[in-house]
């Protein structure tokens, strides 16, 4: 594919992944035509998931701790403050109570979340709060959540977040390009976003609740990967419908297809409405079955979440003590 512009100097570089970064490929409409999705088969596959594969009790705690390390701990509220962001960063550095980690034999291991995700206004605050922790800051960008600001404003927003120290940028695509089948426009937009990010990794939010069909989800995913997305992400968390297992299966199969065609590994991030520990186990099972162990690590799997962490902590406490503390 065409080479990308040189990376910009960067203050908070992501640790290099265990695999090469997705460089993208030249736009090829035939790849989009090839995206075939069988809705009823996908729904059947997902419906049988909870009964077909259960994670054994002892393994559950390990899987949930792994989920914590893949979490983008997030606050995206209109009433966010610097104080709230600093508290979130403190939690990201120590997401699970020390006594629980000791009981699980993980006291030495220093568990932390995959990233902290905030609005651009709070990037510098989060970078300062996380200094020395190795936890990257992810900024949502490009006129999130609707993505309807002018293109040059989107690029400037990305560049400012990167210069403030964001190591990851979660962008939103223009849904109209998907709904009208204007795939070249989507590709060009995504290519520009990737270039503006420089060394920062880019997660493409497909807003799957807005683009309506699984076929659209599949095609939008493929176009964003062709244009160099490091991750594809289900949702902003602001749509009426957020992450679902059926949409997830569709996106995972596109990741696998793209990897088969190019050799590039692209990450996956479900987001929005994932608040129960038992739900995240289903996502993990699907990831493992569709893509394998490589997609269990934070360089290829992230979970967008705010309230999920509290439930995971409750489940870990139950695992250790046999009882639940009061849900606060």
Regions found by a protein language model. Give the residues of each.
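N-terminal amphipathic/basic-hydrophobic helices that include classical n-h-c signal peptides
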Residues: 1-7, 11, 253, 260
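Polar low-complexity intrinsically disordered regions enriched in Ser/Thr and small residues
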Residues: 2-4, 23, 325
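Alpha/beta catalytic barrel-like cores
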Residues: 8-105, 109
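Generic low-polarity alpha-helical segments
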Residues: 1-8, 16, 161, 197
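Metal-centered catalytic cores of metalloenzymes
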Residues: 310
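Alpha/beta enzyme core
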Residues: 58-62, 66, 79-111, 120-269, ...
């Amino acid at each position: 594919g065409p080479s990308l512009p040189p990376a910009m100097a960067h203050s908070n570089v992501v640790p290099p992944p265990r695999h090469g970064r997705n460089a993208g490929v030249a736009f090829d409409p035939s790849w989009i035509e090839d995206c075939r999705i069988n809705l009823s088969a996908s729904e059947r596959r997902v419906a049988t998931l909870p009964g077909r594969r259960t994670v054994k009790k002892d393994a559950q705690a390990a899987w949930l701790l792994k989920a914590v390390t893949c979490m983008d701990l997030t606050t995206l509220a209109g009433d966010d403050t610097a104080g709230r962001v600093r508290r979130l960063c403190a939690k990201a550095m120590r997401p699970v109570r020390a006594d629980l980690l000791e009981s699980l034999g993980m006291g030495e291991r220093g568990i932390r979340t995959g990233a902290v995700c905030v609005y651009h206004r709070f990037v510098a605050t989060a970078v300062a709060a996380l200094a020395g922790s190795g936890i990257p800051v992810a900024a949502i960008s490009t006129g999130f959540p609707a993505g309807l600001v002018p293109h040059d404003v989107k690029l400037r927003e990305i560049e400012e977040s990167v210069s403030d120290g964001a190591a990851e940028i979660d962008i939103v695509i223009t849904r109209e390009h998907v709904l009208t089948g204007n795939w070249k426009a989507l590709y060009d937009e995504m290519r520009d976003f990737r270039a503006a990010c420089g060394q920062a990794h880019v997660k493409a939010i497909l807003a799957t609740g807005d683009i309506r069909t699984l076929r659209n989800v599949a095609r939008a995913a493929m176009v964003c990967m062709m244009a160099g997305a490091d991750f594809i992400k289900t949702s902003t968390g602001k749509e009426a419908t957020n992450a679902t297992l059926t949409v997830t299966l569709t996106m995972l199969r596109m990741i696998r297809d793209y990897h088969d065609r190019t050799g590039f590994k692209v990450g996956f991030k479900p987001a929005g409405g994932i608040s129960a520990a038992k739900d995240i186990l289903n996502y993990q099972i699907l990831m493992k079955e569709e893509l394998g162990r490589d997609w269990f690590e934070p360089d290829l799997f992230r979970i967008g979440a705010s309230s999920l962490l509290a439930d995971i902590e409750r489940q870990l406490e139950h695992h250790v003590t046999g009882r639940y503390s009061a849900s606060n």
